[in-house]
A protein has these predicted regions:
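Conserved core of the sugar-phosphate nucleotidyltransferase
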Residues: 88, 146-231, 249
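Conserved N-terminal catalytic core of the sugar/cofactor nucleotidyltransferase
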Residues: 21, 26-35, 62-139, 143-156
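Extreme N-terminal basic, low-complexity initiation segments
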Residues: 2-6
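Low-acidity, Ser/Thr- and Arg-rich intrinsically disordered low-complexity segments
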Residues: 10-18, 22-25
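Left-handed beta-helix
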Residues: 23-30, 232-367
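Short aromatic/basic micro-patch
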Residues: 57, 145, 213, 264-265
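Short glycine-enriched, charge-decorated loop/helix-capping segments at active-site entrances
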Residues: 51-57, 226-229
Length: 367
């Protein structure tokens, strides 16, 4: 899901509507109740920051806010956020997030103390999910760009009686859990990087994203059987895959080609790389609709510091020079020309206007 909804008037409004229609049709076809668990307890030590990792910002928005907004768009029964490191700060921030839809979201918090692995984190959330019907989706609070339609497809693949894993093939799977399939291509288990053999590390390129959809009743049973007999002495959520196979439950590896959707953040460098890749996609979306960007690698669309969600609406024949930053809700009229290194926030630029280089325009938070 894009952090900034790019609206190109007379072009993109129909496309946006079709995306929402598609998402609704997928969830209707899945025909199952949905609960979502978001894991947000990690310390994020490699960020070397006092700010919790899930509150680090991408496109002006906390990573966790991206994920909560994604969850909201799927219209679940309830969302449980698992916190741990700086729990008070994360929970307070999460409760104050500005979300794109007006639909109320039932969001609860549970704390993972101590932090003993991903399986242990989900175990803490289970008491908040009293119903045994439906599907439980597990998301990661530091994986911000998964599209809601992708998660909806995963729920559909689960079908209420299968275990569905979101996977992707990458050139360098170092550090990720690898998908182990049998000779017929059927998923058998996930092996974590530190527990993988040299042969598995060299040959398996398909990785588990950290996102899964599972039948609620089955998931609860598997979680109760987890142990920490591994190199890290942690309770791995990934161990439920082997349990599903042992129980005769089909395991579906829903493999996507877009690695950006499952990219996580563990360091400032990874955050910067993900930011730039995301901004390039936003720039490309504009250019595909006719907006002329002098250099798409030097374009930024972000939420503003007051929390106004990013939305850039462009009419026809708009030109944007290098290094421009747009924050909050901005409208550019027909033929508007934005000079280099301008910062425009919550403003409407008239048709035919010429904004000179290095201009800073702030229309306030109610544009």
């Amino acid at each position: 899901m894009l952090a900034g909804l790019i609206v190109v008037k007379s072009f993109n409004s129909g496309r946006t509507a079709s995306v929402h229609t598609s998402l609704t049709s997928i969830m209707t076809a899945a025909a199952t109740a949905l609960d979502i668990i978001i894991m947000a307890a990690g310390k994020g030590t490699r960020m070397k920051s006092r700010i919790p990792k899930v509150l680090q910002k991408l496109a002006g928005r906390p990573l966790l806010q991206h994920v909560v907004a994604e969850a909201q768009s799927l219209h679940p029964r309830r969302v449980v956020v698992v916190t741990g490191h700086c729990a008070d700060e994360v929970e307070a921030a999460c409760a104050a997030f500005t979300l794109p839809e007006a639909t109320p979201l039932e969001m609860q918090f549970v704390r993972q103390e101590p932090q003993l692995g991903t399986g242990h984190a989900v175990q803490q959330a289970v008491p908040k999910l009293p119903d045994d019907d439906g599907v439980v989706v597990v998301l990661s609070g530091d994986v911000p760009l998964t599209e809601a339609s992708t998660v909806a497809e995963l729920v559909k693949a689960c079908g209420g009686d299968q275990l569905a894993l979101l996977t992707v093939r990458v050139s360098d799977p170092t550090g990720y859990g690898r998908i182990v399939r049998d000779a017929n291509g059927v998923v058998q288990r996930i092996v974590e990087h530190k527990d993988a053999s040299d042969e598995q590390r060299a040959s398996i390129k398909e990785i588990y994203s950290g996102i899964m959809a599972a039948p609620a009743k089955r998931l609860k049973a598997w979680l109760s059987q987890l142990n920490n007999d591994n190199a890290q002495r942690e309770y791995y959520l990934t161990d439920v895959v082997a349990m599903a196979v042992a129980d005769g439950v089909a395991v579906v590896g829903h493999c996507i080609t877009d690695a950006l959707q499952v990219a996580g953040v563990n360091s400032p460098l990874q955050l910067a790389e993900l930011e730039r890749a995301h901004q390039l996609r936003q720039a490309a979306a504009l250019m595909e609709q006719g907006v002329r960007l002098a250099d798409p690698a030097r374009f930024d669309l972000r939420d503003d510091v007051r929390g106004v969600l990013a939305e850039l609406s462009c009419s026809t024949d708009v030109e944007i020079d290098v290094g421009c930053i747009f924050t909050g809700r901005v409208t550019l009229g027909e033929g508007a020309r934005i000079g280099a290194y301008c910062h425009i926030s919550n403003a409407e630029i008239a048709a035919g206007a010429v904004i000179h280089p290095f201009s800073h325009i702030d229309g306030g938070g109610d544009a």
